[in-house]
Design a protein with these regions (language model features):
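Conserved "HGTGT" condensation-loop signature of ketosynthase/thiolase-family condensing enzymes
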Residues: 1-145
Length: 145
């Protein structure tokens, strides 16, 4: 049997956009469910959700790369970056220390997703409906996964 050790954590959640804030929220029994503010939900019959607030993709993902990713992918990249820093495999943003070099056969990352990219899918379907299929982005599929 192989040993498995979790050495780094990262989080982008309704309770906070870093592991410390997230864990403090959990341990202090804070609620991440709040009134929906990201879109008009008045016709859905749903008024609350677990939304991520205060997320700035430019901090870790970068503006250019963020334009090519759905929001859920930006969350994943940010959380993965945090986990690498937490594990000591990457220097913190702005640090003068170089990234630590590791043997790639000695570590890995597990990331799961049920469904994502719905914002990108919705935007492209609306674009196709309103402007025709020629206006759908050729990067539609990669942007949504």
């Amino acid at each position: 049997m192989s040993r498995v050790v979790i050495t780094g954590l990262g989080a982008v959640t309704p309770l906070g956009n870093d592991t410390e804030t997230f864990l403090n929220g959990i341990f202090n029994e804070k609620m991440g469910i709040k009134p929906i503010t990201k879109f008009d939900a008045s016709e859905t019959g749903i008024t609350v959700a677990g939304q991520v607030d205060g997320f700035d993709p430019a901090q870790r993902v970068g503006k250019r790369d963020a334009r090519k990713m759905d929001l859920f992918s930006q969350y994943a990249v940010d959380a993965a970056d945090q986990a690498l820093e937490n594990a000591g495999l990457k220097s913190a943003e702005g640090s003068e220390n170089p990234t630590t070099v590791q043997d790639p056969t000695r570590f890995g990352v597990i990331l799961g997703n049920g469904i994502g990219g719905l914002t990108t899918i919705q935007d492209q379907v609306i674009k196709m409906h309103d402007k025709g299929p020629q206006r759908v982005s050729p990067l539609f599929v990669p942007e949504s996964i």
